[in-house]
Amino acid sequence: MRLSPLTGVVLLIKVLFLCAFNLVHHHEREKPMGRVDGKVAIVSGAALGIGKAAALLLAQEGASVIVGDINKEEGQKTVSEIEGKGGKAFFLLLDVRKEEDWKSVIEGALSRFGRLDIMVNNAGIAYSGSVESTTLEDWRRVQSINLDGVFLGTKYAIEGIRQHGAGGSIINLSSIEGLIGDPELAAYNASKGGVRIFTKSSALHCAKAGYKIRVNSVHPGYIWTPMVAGLTQEDEAARKRLVDLHPIGHLGEPDDIAYGILYLASDESKFVTGSELVIDGGYTAQ
């Protein structure tokens, strides 16, 4: 069917209008929406990777952020990036295995910002080894960081959040390896599986106590972070094998997880507690 010149012009105008609308709408989506405006967050392991991405995004969306890490140099860089974009943040040294560090960080949040609303227990390490090859020393090291750190962070965050009485959100980073087993990840599986079920216990405790504190776990697939890069040791073939594990066809990026954390931190998830947010490119759907 041949269109008249007038009809063609009208269609062209409509197409141009839709393109302009979509472009404006895209830019609007990129603008901060204040989803956690006025809230105060602590992010452990916020110097690099997922923790850094979460700290940056929470700050962008209006939260004041305590950057906790053992890596002071990189942690200060995270703070500088946040402040450079007009956000509020400061760094506190945090070894998640140490109870005294946790007490200091919670007190630091309360003294600096007067409250605590959000805790992101992100710090963790990877370790590869079967049940036979893993030493007791390595087993305990993995549990002390990945599981003890989440226990301490949750325990003291509850105490800190309760002080203002308005409730809050605790987000614990588990993994797809907390949902499924891997013969070469005995200690890591145990630690991340522990985070998963500990999160549910904590969520029930807070709900039944009437604290208005939600507790949820996030389960990333393989995300291209320094930790995962270290596992592949810059081996392109190893990276391709990781990519092939994900039906979506690529590895995740730190921001993919940060947006999930933001949702759980915000009031948009006010009916979500004791849940598992799996962000894995289809890995566990197979």
Explain the meaning of each model-derived region.
Residues K14-V15, I180, I248, I261-L262, ...:
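Short C-terminal tail/terminal secondary-structure segment
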Residues G34-I66:
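Canonical Rossmann dinucleotide-binding motif of NAD(H)/NADP(H)-dependent dehydrogenases/reductases
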Residues S130-V131, T135-Q143, A238, L242:
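Substrate-binding pocket helix/loop in short-chain dehydrogenase/reductase
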Residues E159, L204-K208, K270:
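Alpha-helical segment proximal to the catalytic Tyr-Lys
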Residues S175:
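Residue(s) in the substrate-gating loop at a strand-loop-helix junction
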Residues K212-R214, V272-G274:
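Short, small/polar-rich loop/turn modules that mediate ligand/substrate recognition or access, typified
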